[in-house]
Amino acid sequence: MKTSIATVSISGDLREKLAAIAAAGFDGVEIFENDFLAYDGSPAEVGRMVRDHGLEITLFQPFRDFEGMPEQQRSRAFERAERKFDLMQELGTDLMLVCSNVSPLALGGIDRAADDFRELGERAGRRALRVGYEALAWGRHTSDHRDAWEIVRRANHPNIGLILDSFHTLARRMDVETIRAIPGDRIFIVQLADAPLIDMDLLYWSRHFRNMPGEGDLPVVDFMRAVAATGYDGPLSLEIFNDQFRGGSPRSIAVDGHRSLVYLMDQVARAEPDIAIDVPALPERVAVSGIEFVEFAANETEAEELVLLLRAMGFSLIGRHKNKDVVLLRQGAINIVVNTEKEGLAHSSYLVHGASAYAFGLKVDDAAATVARARALGAELFEQRHGPDELAIPAIRGVGGGVIYFIDGKSELAKVWEIEFEPANDAGNDAGLMAIDHLAQSMNYEEMLTWLLFYTSIFKTRKLPMVDVIDPAGVVRSQVVESDDGGLRLTLNGAENRRTLAGHFIAESFGSGVQHLAFSCRDIFQTADRLTELGFNVLEISPNYYADLEARLGLEPEFTHRLRARNILFDRDEGGDYFQLYSQTYGEGFFFEIVERHGYRGYGAANAPFRIAAQKRTLRPKGMPRV
């Protein structure tokens, strides 16, 4: 499988782009003409720089407004093409992209266009060059890959071929199955891009909102299955125009791009096993049966406060690590680890972020296979020295530099608590909490696509539609990633400014990370009463919320009174009811949530503005120093 990406897809100057593309593992690069024109080196120097990075130039692009022009403009178009051929030979590439004409001067007619390409093919052939024709979705006369293919077919020249671009086909909702009839050897290169479904002008949509395959809503897998069925075995190249990417990190965007291609072709190869493209074999996407544990890093004072808070939620301290300053608290199937070590990643994380949930462990069928898939998709492995009676738990780095561990039932990993911890007889008072319902990570909005692709490519999950959560200081974008059975539920919350609750958390903890944990319970009313007995400080909700709730959902006054008396929030969808109870904030915005579900599949987005307003009232006032 030969991977490629257009230089226009990432930020930086040409030198920075090439370094990032090579580091991400791509085989080739499309040179976008503006990137070349802005660089102060000669074509030969650019070609050498590309090859010095271990890359090849898969394509030079774009060449515009060529076919179907009146005679005066037609002659000029061929003169321009010859100049581009000179440039290509100096660069060291043999393929040029010609996009369909958008000029108001362009004349229609498939035969006229085919004649032009036949002559261009003759000129290219004399130089051992090739030309690929692409139908722009907004082309004046050619906006459909079927018409572009017919022009190429009638041109009937070995140096003229077709270029397919997933965006141009899918944005116009064309039938991708028509691609299967095209001979694979007549497709010179395939360009790939995804995009969110937005109803807007095609050109503007394409120029500003494309993203990596798997990050948007277009059926790119179906498109690529049809391409693969033709027998095509050439480069797979990303061409992404995205305002957010233009200001992002070249290296992280390039890594996302390579991950997206590997993930895309893994899906295609599983659906079309006899394709000609040589796709690397990966373990299947990983099914997660639950969150085994969450680990906090803290100093002694903050750890003591956290343990007291957890005890007030009904947790028992059941274990102390044999070799480290680490304790284990449990309630139901919830394991919370509190780490106060003075060395290792936990300590480093504490020094940077303060007290935080820096790691969590997922229950999987095969931890080694999970890491193998993650590594093939560009995830960074995590390892650290372990002592006697300690297991080497497979792990990767995640959001904010945190760690995701993997626990399976087929090895010693299933006995990690018995192997590494001494029992502690510090029983608490059970409050009816059962398991971790979901985990929420706050991050800068610009990071959301990265982590969305990270989770959906490695784990057997799906993404739900993005939701705008209204904070008194702005909007937070919330993206749910979940497995069908609820074994893994994550909410990714993207902050665009520091004044929102999520933005405050990111700013004060110096980076993205886990901002809240939600625990499921058997009976939220009994749990709320038990928490009151244990001295748990519940988040107080405005009484105005309950008056509106009763009217909006037609609740019985008695039921509303029970909710209000315990500061329980309530929501309902077509599946059933949902109850939520929150802790006050801990540290710089971390909090716990307790939920009860009755067929409800959402996350209480309707209640979020009222919860956030209540939480912000409890935060340290602006300008007040930390104690």
Name every feature range the model reports, one short phrase each:
Residues 3-7, 29-31, 57-62, 96-98, ...:
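Hydrophobic faces of well-ordered beta-strands that scaffold small-molecule active sites
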Residues 26, 88-93, 187, 232-233, ...:
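A structural motif
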Residues 14, 23, 270, 275-319, ...:
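Glyoxalase I/VOC metalloenzyme domain signal
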Residues 28-29, 119-217:
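Acidic/histidine-rich catalytic cores of soluble enzymes
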